[in-house]
Amino acid sequence: HFVSAMGTTGTITGVSRYLREKNPKVRIIGAQPAEGSRIPGIRKWPLEYQPKIYDPAAVDEEILVDQVEAEEMARRLAREEGIFAGISSGGAAWVAQQVAAREQGATIVFVVCDRGDRYLSTGVFPA
């Protein structure tokens, strides 16, 4: 399983193509913001405005992540794993964790797609 935040959709589309060349059975899962969530770097594109690079067939499933869950996971990544990642990476990690809970024994990879230093002035990472 491969999990990625879906911003411009370039990463998830490109990685999907590459991984499926190697293993057509790989599952590609996108992290999308839940209704009302404002997660920098993740965007739920209206159908008429989807990026031209995006191939809907490249993604098997989209899982919604709430802003609070994404921010908390970004803090956990920093505190518990030493990975200073941003909020969209926190969202992807949260989705990966949900997939891991339901797919016992599966190999799951997610992309850390942004840095935490961009959010130091926002209060996401308290001192």
Report residues per predicted region.
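Beta-strand segments within the central parallel beta-sheet cores of soluble alpha/beta enzyme folds
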Residues: 1-3, 27-34, 106-113
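Glycine-rich beta-alpha junction loops
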Residues: 7-10, 32-37, 46, 67, ...
